[in-house]
């Protein structure tokens, strides 16, 4: 882990782990560095802005973890899974990606339509963010609200439909069909999350 990157610091791959709002400050540093392989990790809904850095092989990734930093410690949950890949549908980096994680315990899913994946993820998250706003971060107030959880599902499906009309694929595969065909089950899962620490760590701590 580094917090400084000079022009002559050469790495096989650089993982950029940062808030989306901080990326514009980091990109000039990345451009100035001579390392070729760059992986932007996180909720990035503006992939188009960062996917064509000159002389760089740019990948995007989403790591299955969430948490919040407190004074002196971090409260977190981590599934040790990562979705990573290109944005153009080509599999030319698959072997390189596998080599990065070869001696780790991280479960890797290679997805070479990461722009579609990250936009799909944003669609799923946004209604949950507004749910947090509705109750000022106390999601337990919604744990028995079946009607509202179904409205969340309606919102997610509506967003997915917009994405599809814009030409994007809803990813991971089967996600759209699950929302349509298992709507009540998905709504129940959200109510379960609202009732415990999962909702706090994965939703409200990020939203508020």
List the model feature ranges, each with a label.
Residues 2-74:
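Rossmann-like NAD(P)(H) cofactor-binding subdomain of soluble oxidoreductases
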Residues 45-121, 126-127:
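Rossmann-fold dinucleotide-binding core
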Residues 115-143, 147-160:
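Active-site-proximal catalytic alpha-helix in oxidoreductases
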Residues 147-198:
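Small-residue-rich helix-loop
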Residues 198-208:
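C-terminal helical cap and adjacent loop that interface with cofactors, partners, or active-site loops
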